[in-house]
Amino acid sequence: LVPATGFYEWRASKDGKTPFFIHPKDIELYSFAGIWSTWKNEDGQEIKTYSIMTTEPNSEMKAIHNRMPVILHPEDEASWIEPSNDNPESLEKLLFPLEDDSLEIYEVSRAVNNPINNDKYLILAA
């Protein structure tokens, strides 16, 4: 599980990329479906990595991007992390877009493009 309160996505246009902040309307803290791995590089150093699963966009996200992160419903979180679950089909059924009309999406400042910036104003509507 990758906890989140929102995420950014950029819509490409002739004027460049426009950043948007996106979050579920009715859930303050939620989880992305994540996968992780530990491996050793050629020097023998252990490397820990993770990734967020994506799926096709719902109707709201289609206007911005061709995919979206998998946002798990709270009741599905335990199934996603159950270590004894070795049935891929039961997990695949969780990899779907969030329901239409469930996201709040708004444009934010391009200041979010600079990794030096780290402030709550970055999630405010532009």
Q: Whereabouts are the PLM-identified features?
A:
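Short linear sequence motif anchored by a di-proline
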Residues: 1-126
